[in-house]
From Swiss-Prot:
Free-text function comment from the UniProt entry: Negatively regulates transcription of bacterial ribonucleotide reductase nrd genes and operons by binding to NrdR-boxes.
Domain ATP-cone per the UniProt entry, residue ranges: 49-139
GO terms of molecular function: ATP binding; DNA binding; zinc ion binding
HAMAP family, per the entry: NrdR (MF_00440)
Organism: Haemophilus ducreyi (strain 35000HP / ATCC 700724)
Keywords (A to Z) from UniProt: ATP-binding, DNA-binding, Metal-binding, Nucleotide-binding, Repressor, Transcription, Transcription regulation, Zinc, Zinc-finger
Protein name: Transcriptional repressor NrdR
ZnF region ranges: unnamed: 3-34
Length: 149
């Protein structure tokens, strides 16, 4: 690997360890030429599937759309940005791990709901109310009762 400081081609690995719950390898490297040290992360590259919308259209997975919808549900909630990033990373990992070329949008919605349920119950209800198209207070009540179980 090239050194990011002097662009020399030879570097050596000083230390390797697992990171990101075992899904990445963190390596400390040292440049043979300039002796600078830097960190790299190695992970398997898996393609994200296309999303099949409810109307049958297919579109590439849109990370921005997922981030916006989760952040909208989490607006004014006491949740750290790193926790939101972890939920997003977990959703992306789960989508890649499916190994499917296409996934229904409902699957992405359910993964988002699962992540929010673990993170913040109020945000979960907010997201569910839009995603599941709640029509009346009874549907809110049923979903809240499920959370209490």
């Amino acid at each position: 690997m090239r050194c990011p400081f002097c662009t020399a081609e030879e570097t050596k690995v000083i230390d390797s360890r697992l990171a990101a719950d075992g899904y990445q390898i963190r390596r400390r490297r040292e440049c043979i030429g300039c002796k600078e040290r830097f960190t790299t992360f190695e992970s398997a590259e898996l393609a994200l599937p296309y999303i099949i919308k409810n109307n049958g259209n297919r579109e590439p997975f849109d990370l921005n759309k997922l981030e916006v919808s989760l952040n909208r549900a989490l607006e004014k909630r006491p949740v750290h940005a790193d926790d939101v990033d972890n939920v997003i990373s977990k959703i992306i990992f789960q989508l890649k791990a499916l190994g499917e070329r296409e996934v229904p949008s409902k699957s992405v919605g359910h993964l988002a709901m699962d992540g929010l349920k673990q993170l913040d119950k109020v945000a979960y209800i907010r997201f569910a109310s839009v995603y599941l198209s709640f029509d009346d207070i009874e549907e809110f009540t049923k979903e809240i009762e499920k959370l209490r179980e």
